Amino acid sequence: MKTFAYRLHFQIRKRLSGKHKLVLYSNRFNACFISQKLRDKVPTNHIMFKNTMRSYSYIFFALFGIALLLPYTVVAGTQAKAKVAIFYTVTTPQLKSDVERALRDELSSNIELITCEEASIFKEIVAEGYVGQKPAAKYAAIYLEQVESGADVVLSVCSSVADIAYAMRDISAFMGVPLIDINEEMCREAVRKGCKITVVATFPSAIGPIGRTLERKSREMGKHIEVRSVLVNGGFGLDKETFKSLMAKELKKPAESSDVIIFAQSSMAYCANYIKELYGKEVLSNPKFGAKAVRAALLNKGLIK
């Protein structure tokens, strides 16, 4: 302590340039600097400066702790955001808004959203009536492009390509970039909540893949389910109020005998609460379930906390 005090005394005297004459006051307990005049009045064995030195110690250790934590604070503040690629094969402004809002609500500002779209995939599936080699190859190529561009997770939004996403699960696991079907967790939740499940879609190409996903989930959970479908022809692209009226009309009778109603397309999500309140049935839409699946994938990779 005395050695430290003498050094400090030297530095203080040097900085003050002789303006104030300071002398070292010390005993076996304490050491500090006082004026020459005050030093002459204080007994040598006095320990009145104990609290002063204790305060110096607290300040020293506080500054030392800040110095230790500062590098980690800087690293945390500059950590790169996780990149989430959203893969569309068909879009509307409402669809994009619902999907992106669900992701940001679930993940806050911890992500960077990358949008990719290939409309020809959906058009070819609709034209052929099934997922042929050409649209499947395009889908796989776009996934690999997102991997090369640095995406951490790829969220597949279109229900019509759900079978391709399922077929590519081993490839995505090998790549270390999860390919998430936006319907997967929604279908799991539907099986949890009931046995009589009604699938609603505006395109027939979305119904088959959703039905197969429900069947897989029911097998995994050891549960028998009954799946029915409702095709709302001409519903895609309508304004909100017109679409809600059409949905209410088409679902009036099926809702009576359903435990759960699921919307096969993300573009229908805004109508979920309306139908739920109208018929008192559990209604599930996929954006929020897709967002939860993305969060789980990023947690598994250690990219978010």
Give the ranges of each region predicted by the language model.
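Serine residues within intrinsically disordered or low-complexity segments
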Residues: 17, 26, 35, 55-57
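Bacterial N-terminal signal peptides
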Residues: 60-71
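Polybasic, lysine-rich low-complexity intrinsically disordered segments
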Residues: 2-3, 12-14, 19, 37, ...
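Non-catalytic structural scaffold of enzyme domains
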Residues: 77-305
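Bacterial Sec-dependent signal peptides at the C-terminal "C-region" and cleavage site
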Residues: 69-79
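Bacterial N-terminal signal peptides that target proteins for export
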Residues: 49-60
